[in-house]
Amino acid sequence: MERLLIVNADDFGLSKGQNYGIIEACRNGIVTSTTALVNGQAIDHAVQLSRDEPSLAIGMHFVLTMGKPLTAMPGLTRDGVLGKWIWQLAEEDALPLEEITQELASQYLRFIELFGRKPTHLDSHHHVHMFPQIFPIVARFAAEEGIALRIDRQPLSNSGDLPANLRSSQGFSSAFYGEEISEALFLQVLDDASHRGDLSLEVMCHPAFIDNTIRQSAYCFPRLTELEVLTSASLKYAIAERGYRLGSYLNV
């Protein structure tokens, strides 16, 4: 039985090196989808590149941990910027949910303004949309807008409460990440999903060329290794041999 494989490159708009890596992995590799940070420093560059790559499906990478928000968020920002202290606020059950709801809507409208169309789907930077307090907001928004949502079902305990019309892949994997990136690792992700019986799978990735912005990231050089693996001709053949068809959330 043929299975759907969505290879989604996160962080479109983070930097020019990230943007070029994603485009390369789409044009000469197996990346079929990406998600864009509308407040990223290189988002305009990402928009420009995307015009020459119409086959690349583009979703929105909801941002609550980096850069400046599009709306006033006094309950989440420090000195006007977002940061990883959101984890502490979540643990303290002190997240400003109304502010987050407004910011989600603003980033969504900004995406449409930039790309001229709705995103194919939603996910988030550092997976913050999977926080128990935030997930219902994002799930409801995605269902209302008729777009798909990345769902990591491992930390999700209330999957029975999902909106009836919410679209997603059956499986999601973030395992293609870290210091041991290889073609074998990618194929193991597919084999694990097949054993679970997933008929559709999203694999998250971060292919990039190294630039000054990426150098500052804790996850730097493995992005270049990801790019090498994702553009391997042998990987594309191995995917087909396992009965997977490359696609995007438009196929879900």
From Swiss-Prot:
Keywords: Carbohydrate metabolism, Chitin degradation, Cytoplasm, Hydrolase, Magnesium, Metal-binding, Polysaccharide degradation. GO terms for cellular component: cytoplasm. Its EC number is 3.5.1.105. InterPro entries: COD_ChbG_bac (IPR022948), Glyco_hydro/deAcase_b/a-brl (IPR011330), YdjC-like (IPR006879). GO terms for molecular function: chitin disaccharide deacetylase activity; deacetylase activity; metal ion binding. It catalyses: N,N'-diacetylchitobiose + H2O = N-acetyl-beta-D-glucosaminyl-(1->4)-D-glucosamine + acetate; diacetylchitobiose-6'-phosphate + H2O = N'-monoacetylchitobiose-6'-phosphate + acetate. Its cofactor is Mg(2+). Mg(2+) binds at residues 61, 125. Its main location: cytoplasm. GO terms for biological process: chitin catabolic process; diacetylchitobiose catabolic process; polysaccharide catabolic process. It is found in: Cytoplasm. Pfam families: YdjC. Homodimer. Involved in the degradation of chitin. ChbG is essential for growth on the acetylated chitooligosaccharides chitobiose and chitotriose but is dispensable for growth on cellobiose and chitosan dimer, the deacetylated form of chitobiose. Deacetylation of chitobiose-6-P and chitotriose-6-P is necessary for both the activation of the chb promoter by the regulatory protein ChbR and the hydrolysis of phosphorylated beta-glucosides by the phospho-beta-glucosidase ChbF. HAMAP family: COD. This is Chitooligosaccharide deacetylase.
